[in-house]
Amino acid sequence: MDLFSVRMRAQKNGKHVSGAERIVKKEELETAVKELLNRPKEFDFMNVKVEKVKDFEVVKFNLKISTYSFKSPEEAREFAVKKLTQEGIKEEVAKKAVEILSKGANPKGGNMRGAVLMDIETGERLEEDKERGVRTIHFDWKDRKKVTEKLLKEGYTLRTVDALALTFKNLFCGVVAELCWSDDPDYVTGYVSGKEIGYVRITPLKEKGDPLGGRVYFVSRKELSEIIECLTQKVVLIEL
């Protein structure tokens, strides 16, 4: 079976605004490209890349999903830190991750295109390029239509469909835990994840209207090169 990776990234005024990937059969290419073309709300630059997949691994999804709501971002962030400590992340390291996303992870101000890689022991940022970060690519659901229908029926959103796949690949590649909330000013739900705590949706992790957001991957320094290689090179299809 021939599979193709379809990746889209879009920018506006030089800033990353949208990105997504689908891994599909040849006969599904046109549909996938059209879907990704319509994904960004606004942009002045878009790049769509189609690549034939050489090797891939099918992995069974095994994360539990939970949802928690709070009265304020402060309460929600405290809970996020608590859940991360349950995954073995030191409290001060988890708090540092929250602070980085709340202030804007890009050292020059604003958001990063990719994720922060944070040392689980020291809280030090390990990504080589601290403006771009590291992006998780080359992953999708084996049967995206089936997964989407199931999750929507259970009350989840399309965002959750994509986020679950992304964070599952992260954990598969050796990321110990993840903290994420969107840079979309209108979307205030985020999550933490780990093999023990599962995928934990938390709202609101920021105030409505706040344009800052991003991802922090908590990683072991000694496994850094292997993790980055897996995140950026290995093709993973996830089976629900």
UniProtKB/Swiss-Prot annotation:
Keywords: ATP-binding, Biotin biosynthesis, Ligase, Magnesium, Nucleotide-binding. GO terms for biological process: biotin biosynthetic process. Pathway: Metabolic intermediate metabolism; pimeloyl-CoA biosynthesis; pimeloyl-CoA from pimelate: step 1/1. The keyword Ligase applies. The keyword ATP-binding applies. It comes from the Bacteria. Its EC number is 6.2.1.14. GO terms for molecular function: 6-carboxyhexanoate-CoA ligase activity; ATP binding; magnesium ion binding. Catalyzes the transformation of pimelate into pimeloyl-CoA with concomitant hydrolysis of ATP to AMP. Belongs to the BioW family. Homodimer. This is 6-carboxyhexanoate--CoA ligase. It comes from Aquifex aeolicus (strain VF5). The lineage of its organism: Bacteria, Pseudomonadati, Aquificota, Aquificia, Aquificales.
